[in-house]
Amino acid sequence: MTSITTIPLSTLRSSLPARPDAAAAPQRWRVADIEALYALPFMDLLFRAQQVHRANFDANQVQLSTLLSIKTGGCAEDCGYCPQSSHFETEVKASKLMALDEVMAAAQAAKDQGATRFCMGAAWSRPKERDMERVTEMVREVRGLGLETCMTLGMLEAEQAQALKDAGLDYYNHNLDSSPEFYGSIISTRTYQDRLDTLENVRGAGINVCCGGIVGMGESRAQRAGLVAQLANLEPYPESVPINNLVAVEGTPLADTPPLDPFEFVRTIAVARITMPRTMVRLSAGREQMDEALQALCFMAGANSIFYGDRLLTTSNPQADKDRQLFARLGLKVQGERPAATVQG
């Protein structure tokens, strides 16, 4: 039997517990440490990530999340990847904030399809005070269905974060998007510190943090490692980390960006799992461009949640039936449901 070659733990400062029931020691991750993880042979990296994953989660279980755009387009920010920006000519048309009954119908449909988490996104730079009453009502009503709630509304002041907490919000999403070094290449209207300040306000209100980023925007591996380092070194690191693979949309500055190598995306999932052992690593945008084998590798690397349904904000997503078929073929259980039957043949 061939042994697996690994870099010494002292070199990588691994967060892998000594025993499956042992707590991972807090640590600061250097970008160089994370680059060393990226550089591992692919099979060794996945083996490592699986060890960490199994020490903290049921490796054969995934959570289904549904994401609804409650206010689409017309955003004042100039994020180069985003078709909702008012700075770019895309097919996305601006809309007003959805009515509560429309949101509730979508939430009920998501629950009926097996989702246990419902995320609501609004294309705002930051929510206006006149909108806070409506979005907090959405949180209360969706939570009343028994769904875990998440919102992404842009930058938040401390008082707004507290209002969402008082309404019962479980998670707030505000992505870092990239490493600090690459950030200026894609966004000029919002600083990196603005994002960190919002995360601090969310954490200060006692809301769980959902924070990840986008890969495949033309960044280097070192810059991908820099993003993971930023996430892993947040104190504490996020409870939820969505990893997005760029969906290049016509009309945006990144429309012609070459796609990221698929194995590099899997490596990013694995590195996120190793550096943030107890976070929910969520396969997010870009999944429609992945074949089933690539998605299976992502689950092996430590992803344990997907966004489920036909759309992610303004981009398409694999059909729910296809996801169910894939879960059955892989023997994956959906959180909150009985295990799927194994498909033969």
Swiss-Prot record:
Which residues are [2Fe-2S] cluster-binding?
119, 150, 210, 282
One GO MF annotation is: 2 iron, 2 sulfur cluster binding
Please give the pathway this protein is involved in: Cofactor biosynthesis; biotin biosynthesis; biotin from 7,8-diaminononanoate: step 2/2
EC numbers listed for it are: 2.8.1.6
The entry marks the following residues as binding [4Fe-4S] cluster, namely 75, 79, 82
> How many cofactors are bound and how?
Binds 1 [4Fe-4S] cluster. The cluster is coordinated with 3 cysteines and an exchangeable S-adenosyl-L-methionine. Binds 1 [2Fe-2S] cluster. The cluster is coordinated with 3 cysteines and 1 arginine.
Give the SMART domains listed for this entry. BATS (SM00876), Elp3 (SM00729)
User: Which InterPro entries does the UniProt entry name for this protein?
Assistant: Aldolase_TIM, BATS_dom, Biotin_synth/BioAB, Biotin_synthase, Elp3/MiaA/NifB-like_rSAM, rSAM
**CDD domains noted in UniProt:** Radical_SAM (cd01335)
**Required co-factor?**
[4Fe-4S] cluster; [2Fe-2S] cluster
Q: What catalytic activity does the UniProt entry give for this protein? A: (4R,5S)-dethiobiotin + (sulfur carrier)-SH + 2 reduced [2Fe-2S]-[ferredoxin] + 2 S-adenosyl-L-methionine = (sulfur carrier)-H + biotin + 2 5'-deoxyadenosine + 2 L-methionine + 2 oxidized [2Fe-2S]-[ferredoxin]
* GO BP: biotin biosynthetic process
Keyword line: 2Fe-2S, 4Fe-4S, Biotin biosynthesis, Iron, Iron-sulfur, Metal-binding, S-adenosyl-L-methionine, Transferase
Q: Which residues form the Radical SAM core domain?
A: 60-287
Which Gene3D superfamilies does this one have?
Aldolase class I
Task: Tell me which family the UniProt entry assigns to this protein.
Answer: Belongs to the radical SAM superfamily. Biotin synthase family.
Protein purpose: Catalyzes the conversion of dethiobiotin (DTB) to biotin by the insertion of a sulfur atom into dethiobiotin via a radical-based mechanism.
Assembly behavior: Homodimer.
Please report the name of this protein according to its UniProt entry.
Biotin synthase
